[in-house]
């Protein structure tokens, strides 16, 4: 027993695990690349597709015979040629039968073969299939020694290594596949254009791509649609890689009082049902405004998805949002990767055209040799027949006097110098061939064979003659399968600028404590006299109230800065417009806020100019300034870091600082104000902390800040019980940054603590005051008395509610005077 174990141990070879894994993975990779995922550059088929078509050919399932069960076909494929799962084989067969997947179907399916809505095909035991005329052309001449056959997986049968493919299947139907470390994505094309290009290359071997582009306009998807921009097409055809934008084809129908958008053609590989659901969700969530209903009216006549618009909706704006937010516009990546000589390679369009032509030449040469040998063999026999017919009496005598067939055969060979094949054919010839009519047929057949042999020899000897045959067969295929172009191609990509379609009007943007945001036309709010009761500005959920509002133009950029120091930006028009009493939309649907992250400041700006900066203020008195240009870019949804906060601190506000600014003023909850030079806070990067702006007493914290450009600037302070006053900036003496400040407003039990301080240089502005119960009142600022810094102010609103925010806004009569500088910032 021990000796046996020793002998077994001697047969063990130790190898490094890294080298073993490397070799095994390489073998697996090549197996996937060559044997599964990528098509051959010549016939455009992956192994599974080639085996399916060959199995159908062996079953005799031509386009003119009765259908056979798909299960029978799949069984033959996996049993004889493709030792993989039946589901994978059936899925491949199903795809070849789908008119929305293939530009030229290779399988004629009967039964449920799936739909563009993503519905699965029926089980293979229910469906039936046969070949189409297109797949017959791919297999044509396979029995004429045109291709090589290789052993199948168990070496019991032979299968084709490649198919003759009389039609350029790779470019006509395209291909998609993901291998190991590489992928292919070849779009389908119109067969007429591809064959015209092939004919041109055949006659002009040195043809340039520019000339080919006169024939091949671009991809032609089975689902139609519109390709925008030719640059991506040219790049793909030139280098083998490119990208094109594909849009659904739509038209707008007008009814009595509204419009409907009708979608008639889909981008390639788009699931219609999911698209309809996607549009419905976006409309329901108000991410796309103006849609009242979406319904699918598609039937056997074709696709028809109806998007019904609201009465006041503009179809151009809705379409622009649909293209940006849904799969009504997709990007198709073109990768012309295929297998040639057992190796994967990225080809240019010209290389693929030349490869197919070379393949067809090889097929035709092999077929010609096969037919030539067959014709020569037949002519040889006919020559024997003619000798026999000329000497029929003597031949009959020789046969009659011969003791055996073998002796008769030898006698004929010796007497008339015949070959063994000829003498055998004469002995097997029927007596009816001796009639005069049959003699003439033999002579005619022989003469025709001589002409055929001469013609076949001409093909083999002349390159021009060979090219002529290739071209003739290509034109026959074109005539048989010609079809109109389905995909429209626009010269350039045009995206409608939504801003150009939206009027630049002042809006009141409000946000609730729980983060519901909306915008309302400024005209919806009426001006009232000082001391008025106010008007309800919006309904809220229970335990929620409007805590933040501001005025901005629809084209302005809103900067949202959160308590965690994160900054987000969004165009005003992207905030859903609502009625004055509506609750609005959750801000988390517009920007990506983290848990417990709350917006503390919202600013309005026209652009991200480097001539301005942002000043940030924290609850514990830290101030920081960063150039505005550092916050531009496309990270509007995920946000960008604006300030680094100390532990336990949080951001309470921010300000836009322009070149005219001279001082910063910070105000605290207990009424302390500090004014210091702007130069004391130099500009620093985004991911920094800042410096101390005000030193706070116990239980005190920052509630607001103002940027001062001149000592004549007026500041308006408002307490939580609704008292307010105007004070000149010069009333607050300049101090060094980091001090405790001076009393800015006399606070008593009647006034309550300080809520906010804002700049109000324009007396023609109105003051908007917001209470915790969502009441809002507009008061003319010129009606608010100017007092000293140590005064308490006058009553601005008669209500038992606590004031939570205040802001200035343009008067309703002069909305055109709205400027970025008039839009103030709000702080808690």
From Swiss-Prot:
Active-site residues (renumbered): 126 (o-(5'-phospho-dna)-tyrosine intermediate)
GO cellular component term of the entry, any: DNA topoisomerase type II (double strand cut, ATP-hydrolyzing) complex
EC number: 5.6.2.2
The reaction(s) this protein catalyses: ATP-dependent breakage, passage and rejoining of double-stranded DNA
One MF term in the entry's GO annotations: DNA negative supercoiling activity
UniProt cross-references to Gene3D superfamilies, sorted A to Z: 3.30.1360.40, DNA gyrase/topoisomerase IV, subunit A, C-terminal, Topoisomerase II, domain 5, Topoisomerase, domain 3
Compartments where found: Cytoplasm
Family matches, as Pfam families: DNA_gyraseA_C, DNA_topoisoIV
Family to which this protein belongs: Belongs to the type II topoisomerase GyrA/ParC subunit family.
Additional facts recorded: Few gyrases are as efficient as E.coli at forming negative supercoils. Not all organisms have 2 type II topoisomerases; in organisms with a single type II topoisomerase this enzyme also has to decatenate newly replicated chromosomes.
Record's function text: A type II topoisomerase that negatively supercoils closed circular double-stranded (ds) DNA in an ATP-dependent manner to modulate DNA topology and maintain chromosomes in an underwound state. Negative supercoiling favors strand separation, and DNA replication, transcription, recombination and repair, all of which involve strand separation. Also able to catalyze the interconversion of other topological isomers of dsDNA rings, including catenanes and knotted rings. Type II topoisomerases break and join 2 DNA strands simultaneously in an ATP-dependent manner.
Designated name of the protein: DNA gyrase subunit A
Source species of the chain: Helicobacter pylori (strain J99 / ATCC 700824)
Primary gene name: gyrA
């Amino acid at each position: 027993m021990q000796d046996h174990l020793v002998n077994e141990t001697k047969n063990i070879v130790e190898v490094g695990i890294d080298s073993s894994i490397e070799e095994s993975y390489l073998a697996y990779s090549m197996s996937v690349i060559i044997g599964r995922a990528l098509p051959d550059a010549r016939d455009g088929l992956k192994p599974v597709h080639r085996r399916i078509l060959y199995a159908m050919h062996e079953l005799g399932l031509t386009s003119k015979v009765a259908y056979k069960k798909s299960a029978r076909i799949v069984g033959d494929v996996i049993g004889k040629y493709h030792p993989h799962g039946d589901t994978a084989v059936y899925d491949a067969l199903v795809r070849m039968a789908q008119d929305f997947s293939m530009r030229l179907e290779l399988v004629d399916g009967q039964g449920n073969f799936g739909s563009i809505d993503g519905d699965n095909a029926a089980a293979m035991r229910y469906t039936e299939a046969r070949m189409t005329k297109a797949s017959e052309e791919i297999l044509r001449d396979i029995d004429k020694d045109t291709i090589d056959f290789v052993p199948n997986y168990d070496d019991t049968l032979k299968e084709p290594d490649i198919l003759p493919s009389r039609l350029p299947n790779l470019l006509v139907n395209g291909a998609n596949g993901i291998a190991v470390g590489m992928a292919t994505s070849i779009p389908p094309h119109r067969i007429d254009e591809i064959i015209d290009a092939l004919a041109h290359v055949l006659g002009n071997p040195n043809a340039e791509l520019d000339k080919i582009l006169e024939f091949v306009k671009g991809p032609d998807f089975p689902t139609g649609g519109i390709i925008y921009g030719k640059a991506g097409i040219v790049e793909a055809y030139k280098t083998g890689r490119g990208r094109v934008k594909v849009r659904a084809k739509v038209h707008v129908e007008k009814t009595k009082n509204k419009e409907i958008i009708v979608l008639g053609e889909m981008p390639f590989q788009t699931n219609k049902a999911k698209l309809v659901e996607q549009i419905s969700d976006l409309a329901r969530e108000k991410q796309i405004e103006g849609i009242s209903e979406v319904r699918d009216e598609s039937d056997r006549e074709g696709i028809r998805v109806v998007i019904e618009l609201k009465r006041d909706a503009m179809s151009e704006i809705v379409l622009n949002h649909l293209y940006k937010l849904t799969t009504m516009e997709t990007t198709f990546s073109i990768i012309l990767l295929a297998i040639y000589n057992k190796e994967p390679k990225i080809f240019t369009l010209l290389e693929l055209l030349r490869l197919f032509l070379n393949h067809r030449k090889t097929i035709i040469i092999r077929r010609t040799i096969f037919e030539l040998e067959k014709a020569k063999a037949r002519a040889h026999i006919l020559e024997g027949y003619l000798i026999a017919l000329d000497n029929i009496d003597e031949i009959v005598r020789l046969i009659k006097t011969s003791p055996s067939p073998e002796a008769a055969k030898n006698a004929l060979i010796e007497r008339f110098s015949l070959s063994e094949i000829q003498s055998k054919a004469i002995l097997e010839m029927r007596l009816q061939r001796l009639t005069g009519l049959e003699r003439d047929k033999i002579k005619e057949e022989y003469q025709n064979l001589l002409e055929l042999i001469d013609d076949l020899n001409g093909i083999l000897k002349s390159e021009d003659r060979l090219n002529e045959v290739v071209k003739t067969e290509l034109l026959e295929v074109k005539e048989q399968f010609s079809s109109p172009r389905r995909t429209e191609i626009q010269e350039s990509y045009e995206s409608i600028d939504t801003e150009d379609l939206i009027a630049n009007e002042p809006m009141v943007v409000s946000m609730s404590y729980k983060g519901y945001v909306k915008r309302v036309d400024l005209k919806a709010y009426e001006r009232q006299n000082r001391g008025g009761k106010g008007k309800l500005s919006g309904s809220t959920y229970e335990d929620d109230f409007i805590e933040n509002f501001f005025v901005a133009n629809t084209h302005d950029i809103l900067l949202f800065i959160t308590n965690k120091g994160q900054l987000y930006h969004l165009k005003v028009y992207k905030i859903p417009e609502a009625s004055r009493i509506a609750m609005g939309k959750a801000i988390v649907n517009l920007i990506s806020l983290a848990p417990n992250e709350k917006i503390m400041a919202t600013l309005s700006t026209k652009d991200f100019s480097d001539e301005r900066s942002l000043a940030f203020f924290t609850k514990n008195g830290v101030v920081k300034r960063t150039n505005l240009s550092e916050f531009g870019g496309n990270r509007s949804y995920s946000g960008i870091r604006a300030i680094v906060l100390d532990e336990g601190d949080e951001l309470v506000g921010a300000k836009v600082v322009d070149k005219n600014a001279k001082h910063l003023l910070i105000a605290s909850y207990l009424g302390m104000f500090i004014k210091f030079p702007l130069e004391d806070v130099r500009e620093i990067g985004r991911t920094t902390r800042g410096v101390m702006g005000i030193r706070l007493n116990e239980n005190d914290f920052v509630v607001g800040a103002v940027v001062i450009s001149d000592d004549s600037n007026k500041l308006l302070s408002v307490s939580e019980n609704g008292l307010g006053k105007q004070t000149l900036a010069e009333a607050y003496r300049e101090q060094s940054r980091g001090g405790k400040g001076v009393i800015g407003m006399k606070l008593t039990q009647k006034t309550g603590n300080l809520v906010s301080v804002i700049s109000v240089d324009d007396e023609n502005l109105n003051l908007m005051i917001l209470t915790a119960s969502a009441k809002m009142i507009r008061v003319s600022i010129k009606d608010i008395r100017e007092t000293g810094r140590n005064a308490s102010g006058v009553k601005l609103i008669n209500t038992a509610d606590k004031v939570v925010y205040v802001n200035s806004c343009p008067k309703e009569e002069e909305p055109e005077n709205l400027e970025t500088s008039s839009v103030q910032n709000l702080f808690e």
